[in-house]
Amino acid sequence: MGSLSSALAQNTYKLIAGSSSGLPDPDGPTPIIPDVFSTWGDYYNYLQQKEHDGISTDTVALMAIAKHNSGKIVEHEHHYKPITFGISLTKEIGKNWNVETGLQYSLLKSNFILGEGEYYIGRDQKVHYLGIPVRTSYKWFNSKRWSAYSSAGFLLNIPIHGKNSVRYVTGATVPYKDSWYFTPSVQWAVGVGTGLQYNLIPKWSLYLEPSFNWYIPNGGAIHTIWTEHPFTITVPFGIRFTW
């Protein structure tokens, strides 16, 4: 859909959810909207006042959703554990000490629900980040194939892009869908971890590194697992080159 449609969808969601929706300002033309509503009854009354011949499909769906809900409008959000894959470049600086950098891709998925039961507005969010880690590690176990180590350092996560997909659900039907792209904020993190490494061939290995991280508040409006749960355990895995 065009930018106007996406702008309308974003503003409709922000109109109902309020400032806590975590949505950025939309691209494209911005429709005139009243103050944010706090109850479903108020929102339904507003939609009835707008009702006219040739009413749009999305407004009909919103009226049905508002009619079948009551009380205060509350947004429920759920954030999934991130998926993180890395390519690590590790330099040995002593018998057991290493320094590391590389690239680390992370996918953050969340869903948000406005409404209850079979009548609701659902929003699925995906945010893609490319991280640059800088860490030091100490190897405390080493054999021919396996090694174990502990690490500490920081990570700069650079946003690639984000996408929101919204759907209006009325019983067994989904009469309206839309989606739009956005750019989230840069995200810094510091953390510690303990990793397990399997040596494939000389210099090349696979690793799995459960880590405890603090994602430093970035002041952005987008809600992710990193912003809502800044102290988070992640389990990066990937390929490592050591020299």
Task: Explain the meaning of each model-derived region.
Residues 11, 79-83, 126-130, 146, ...:
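Residues that define the transmembrane beta-barrel architecture of outer-membrane proteins
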Residues 85-91, 101-105, 132-138, 152-156, ...:
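Residues on the lipid-exposed face of transmembrane beta-strands in outer-membrane beta-barrel proteins
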Residues 1-85, 90-98, 110:
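Conserved catalytic residues of ABC-type ATPase nucleotide-binding domains
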Residues 132, 136-141, 146-152, 165-170:
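C-terminal structural cap/anchor segments
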Residues 96-99, 143-146, 203-206:
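Repeated loop/turn-to-beta-strand initiation elements of outer-membrane beta-barrel proteins
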Residues 19-25, 105-109, 140, 154-162, ...:
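Transmembrane beta-strands of outer-membrane beta-barrel pores
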Residues 183, 187, 199-243:
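Predominantly the C-terminal beta-signal and adjacent terminal strand-loop region
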Residues 48-78, 108-129, 159-185, 221-228:
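Extracellular/periplasm-exposed beta-strand and loop segments of Gram-negative cell-envelope proteins
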